[in-house]
């Protein structure tokens, strides 16, 4: 018997999350920590969104996610994208895809925005020193 294992990834800024979805009993771990214990709480809420939308599909799978890079909210966004993609690929349910897209498109599509590089004569990408013509 061949085990069905699905590997997916999600990205946000410099955070990269890799999710492994396989047959199981509904356990979700992020960096070996159960999702119920993941801190900070606001990031946990963001991660739980695709799990709540999936509903009954979650009871038949275990999801292990490894995430690194970026800040805690970027990591949370990357994790939720990886989880949603993994569940969709594992189940192959078109109604689940519609539910994810209706809720939030970023569940299935990685956010491609990056930090704009700093330029000379200023403290940031756009801010410049004030000019005086007198």
Question: Which residues make up each language-model segment?
Answer:
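Beta-rich strand-turn-strand
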Residues: 73-80
